[in-house]
């Protein structure tokens, strides 16, 4: 498996259910679906060069509508991790198969987020982290 942790300062926890809010807390990482020497555009890939985007939102989004009773025992309530694809700006698409797991915690004015997934799988729309293609150095540089 692969795990990616992101941590950032955030003085305000923006995680309410106002779907009209443009500035909710969220983060994403993006990977090329196919291994090519020339990386796809950083603006969500480009036609013929798809990207796999792992996105987290502090609210439930369309999959977790408001109205669910609060459960103080759950630390990751109302959060979504989405496994997405794009081939350029305005082409963001949900995958039918959601392979990425994870969650985030906001504490002491910081978010700490973890994405996890198997290194490889059978989904042609997912990045495949094969040792012969990716090195740790390349992967870390791409994510940062």
Cite the ranges covered by each PLM segment.
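Residues that flank catalytic or metal-binding motifs in active/ligand-binding sites
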Residues: 23-27, 100, 109-111
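Surface-exposed, glycine/proline- and aromatic-rich loop segments on solvent-exposed faces
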Residues: 1-74, 131-143
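Ser/Thr/Pro-rich, low-complexity mucin-like regions
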Residues: 107-144
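Acidic, contiguous internal or C-terminal segments within carbohydrate-active enzymes
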Residues: 1, 9-10, 103-107, 123-126
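Intrinsically disordered, low-complexity boundary segments flanking structured domains
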Residues: 13-18, 87-91, 124-127
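A generic structural signal for short, non-catalytic loop/turn and secondary-structure boundary residues
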Residues: 22, 93-97, 108, 131
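Short helix-loop boundary/capping segments
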Residues: 61-105
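Generic structural "secondary-structure junction" signal
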Residues: 31, 91-94, 121, 129-131
């Amino acid at each position: 498996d692969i795990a990616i942790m992101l941590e950032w300062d955030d003085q305000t926890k923006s995680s309410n259910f106002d779907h009209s809010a443009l500035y909710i807390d969220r983060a994403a990482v993006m990977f090329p679906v196919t291994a090519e020497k020339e990386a796809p555009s950083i603006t969500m890939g480009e036609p013929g060069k798809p990207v796999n985007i792992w996105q987290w939102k502090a609210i439930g989004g369309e999959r977790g509508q408001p109205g669910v009773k609060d459960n103080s025992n759950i630390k990751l309530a109302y959060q979504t991790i989405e496994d997405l694809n794009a081939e350029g700006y305005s082409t963001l698409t949900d995958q039918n198969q959601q392979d990425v797991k994870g969650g985030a915690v906001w504490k002491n004015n910081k978010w700490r987020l973890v994405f996890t997934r198997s290194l490889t799988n059978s989904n042609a729309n997912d990045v495949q982290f094969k040792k012969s293609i990716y090195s740790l150095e390349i992967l870390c540089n791409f994510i940062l």
